[in-house]
Amino acid sequence: FGVNPNNYRKADFWDLRNLRPPYWLDCDEHYQFEICQLTSKEIFGFQTSHQIATNDLPKKASPIKWKIIHETLRTWGENVYCLSSFKPDNTKDQVIAVSSFFGMEHNSVNGGKIPMSRVIKCGKYAKFHFVGHKEQYQQFSNTIYMCILPKLNLIRREGEDIEYFHLASVQKQQNNESIVDLYYYIPVL
């Protein structure tokens, strides 16, 4: 492969074409996708950060993230964006620092102004649609990165992953479990 994992994570782009997916991934899974151009858009919300050990990747999803998404959808009463960036932690080996911004298109909730904003950067993105249980979502995300992007010859460029959660996610139920409905955008070259 020609580069160590730490330097790979620090690169401006991630070329996953030469990686072999783990045995537990179903690379025959097909997800609806399209290549699109996004325009810049300002969203308003709040920032969170956490760390995850690289040996917990890619099977482990943050339970805190799901709680935040569910509560934000319920409280704000509208669709929610989650912009996430990933980079090696500067102080610890084998740790990824994850920064997420949760936001919406309006700058106020219940009459109160939201002071923090972030701009979704314009550019080329691979857009995927997911509807299913949150437990299935991690498999979806892993399959996109480890199987679908390489199969399509797409290289992830620097930028934030964008998840756009639909309000209906809070209301949909199947077997007493919430169904997640979202679009997932990955910045690509």
Model regions and ranges:
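A solvent-exposed interaction/effector surface
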Residues: 1-189
